[in-house]
């Protein structure tokens, strides 16, 4: 047991009380630390805290199958040492591995098995550093600073803002004036006639019923204001020249 030298706290689990004190003293001398003693049949009733021992030595290991509890009782990197076992070592090693122990090995000459608890506490977790953190973009958040607005002043050019020059209006190719000749064939005569028919009069039309200003719902069938929006009484309304002429 020289390989256990320097371990501070050990647990010796026994099955045979004969020469028990001698075996405990041998373990204490080998480790140089404190040694607790527990019967293998009382192990399931014991109340040892987790990570209590650096070394657990158990004899006649086939008498217990509570290796998971032994794993919790050991400190990280603690050692489980079994000796005087009976039966094939392969099945016992497999059972120990399935309980969570690592580095399980057999010494056929000394008829012993040794295993270790991993270097971390049972149930512990660690953050993985290789995971890439993906930044989530909040697509529902719209910032006014990021939105490109169209400048209204850029929609119109300087030419669009200038008023049309009367001198640039269409004129007769014969007279050179905005007046159609007698036998006009360029279309100016029709254009001037269209402007004349759409010219509005400034005088108010006379109402016979007095309800013309209320809207079409209150106007008669021959009302010259049909189709026009309602207006205030006394308000001057301009009608096209052809609306004041009789159709007959």
Swiss-Prot record:
<feature type="region of interest" description="Fe-S binding site B">
    <location>
        <begin position="209"/>
        <end position="223"/>
    </location>
</feature>
<feature type="binding site">
    <location>
        <position position="172"/>
    </location>
    <ligand>
        <name>[2Fe-2S] cluster</name>
    </ligand>
</feature>
<dbReference type="GO" id="GO:0046872">
    <property type="term" value="F:metal ion binding"/>
</dbReference>
<keyword id="KW-0411">Iron-sulfur</keyword>
<dbReference type="GO" id="GO:0051537">
    <property type="term" value="F:2 iron, 2 sulfur cluster binding"/>
</dbReference>
<protein>
    <recommendedName>
        <fullName>Anamorsin homolog</fullName>
    </recommendedName>
</protein>
<keyword id="KW-0408">Iron</keyword>
<dbReference type="Pfam" id="PF20922">
    <property type="entry name" value="Anamorsin_N"/>
</dbReference>
<feature type="binding site">
    <location>
        <position position="186"/>
    </location>
    <ligand>
        <name>[2Fe-2S] cluster</name>
    </ligand>
</feature>
<comment type="similarity">
    <text>Belongs to the anamorsin family.</text>
</comment>
<dbReference type="GO" id="GO:0016226">
    <property type="term" value="P:iron-sulfur cluster assembly"/>
</dbReference>
<feature type="binding site">
    <location>
        <position position="181"/>
    </location>
    <ligand>
        <name>[2Fe-2S] cluster</name>
    </ligand>
</feature>
<feature type="binding site">
    <location>
        <position position="220"/>
    </location>
    <ligand>
        <name>[4Fe-4S] cluster</name>
    </ligand>
</feature>
<comment type="function">
    <text>Component of the cytosolic iron-sulfur (Fe-S) protein assembly (CIA) machinery. Required for the maturation of extramitochondrial Fe-S proteins. Part of an electron transfer chain functioning in an early step of cytosolic Fe-S biogenesis, facilitating the de novo assembly of a [4Fe-4S] cluster on the cytosolic Fe-S scaffold complex. Electrons are transferred from NADPH via a FAD- and FMN-containing diflavin oxidoreductase.</text>
</comment>
<feature type="region of interest" description="Linker">
    <location>
        <begin position="131"/>
        <end position="161"/>
    </location>
</feature>
<feature type="binding site">
    <location>
        <position position="212"/>
    </location>
    <ligand>
        <name>[4Fe-4S] cluster</name>
    </ligand>
</feature>
<feature type="binding site">
    <location>
        <position position="223"/>
    </location>
    <ligand>
        <name>[4Fe-4S] cluster</name>
    </ligand>
</feature>
<keyword id="KW-0479">Metal-binding</keyword>
<dbReference type="Pfam" id="PF05093">
    <property type="entry name" value="CIAPIN1"/>
</dbReference>
<dbReference type="InterPro" id="IPR046408">
    <property type="entry name" value="CIAPIN1"/>
</dbReference>
<dbReference type="InterPro" id="IPR049011">
    <property type="entry name" value="Anamorsin_N_metazoan"/>
</dbReference>
<dbReference type="InterPro" id="IPR029063">
    <property type="entry name" value="SAM-dependent_MTases_sf"/>
</dbReference>
<keyword id="KW-0001">2Fe-2S</keyword>
<comment type="subunit">
    <text>Monomer.</text>
</comment>
<keyword id="KW-0496">Mitochondrion</keyword>
<feature type="region of interest" description="N-terminal SAM-like domain">
    <location>
        <begin position="4"/>
        <end position="130"/>
    </location>
</feature>
<feature type="short sequence motif" description="Cx2C motif 2">
    <location>
        <begin position="220"/>
        <end position="223"/>
    </location>
</feature>
<keyword id="KW-0004">4Fe-4S</keyword>
<keyword id="KW-0963">Cytoplasm</keyword>
<feature type="region of interest" description="Fe-S binding site A">
    <location>
        <begin position="172"/>
        <end position="186"/>
    </location>
</feature>
<feature type="short sequence motif" description="Cx2C motif 1">
    <location>
        <begin position="209"/>
        <end position="212"/>
    </location>
</feature>
<feature type="binding site">
    <location>
        <position position="209"/>
    </location>
    <ligand>
        <name>[4Fe-4S] cluster</name>
    </ligand>
</feature>
<feature type="binding site">
    <location>
        <position position="184"/>
    </location>
    <ligand>
        <name>[2Fe-2S] cluster</name>
    </ligand>
</feature>
<dbReference type="InterPro" id="IPR007785">
    <property type="entry name" value="Anamorsin"/>
</dbReference>
<dbReference type="GO" id="GO:0051539">
    <property type="term" value="F:4 iron, 4 sulfur cluster binding"/>
</dbReference>
<dbReference type="GO" id="GO:0005758">
    <property type="term" value="C:mitochondrial intermembrane space"/>
</dbReference>
<dbReference type="GO" id="GO:0009055">
    <property type="term" value="F:electron transfer activity"/>
</dbReference>
